Amino acid sequence: KILNMPLRAPMIIVIATEYQYHKKVPPFEQLLSAGAVAQNMLLALESLGYRSVWRTGPLCNTPEVKDYFGVTKQNTICGLIYTGSSSVQMPDRETVDLSDYVEYRQ
């Protein structure tokens, strides 16, 4: 099963950090920026008509995977974006009531 994971899509985009020391941009902000990159890539791919899914998991940051993609030990693979095309129409998701999660203040 593990060996077939890369075959699930014709293209996989790897999102990884490349931490840079900067007194005004701490590592956690750089990590969050990588997450924003992934989300914006998903939006861009969908706008171009592609199907994509952002995956992570226990194998994502193993030394072997990091080495394969040239990600150094101190950096993080934030996700793999599996990308391709499909004629399948995805069903609409049910709208989630955000009132349990969001608090509005004035």
Show the residue positions of the predicted features.
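Aromatic/hydrophobic pocket-lining residues that form π-stacking "cages" and hydrophobic walls in ligand
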Residues: 40-41
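C-terminal helix-cap and adjacent tail motif
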Residues: 76-106
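GST superfamily/GST-like fold recognition
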Residues: 29, 50-64
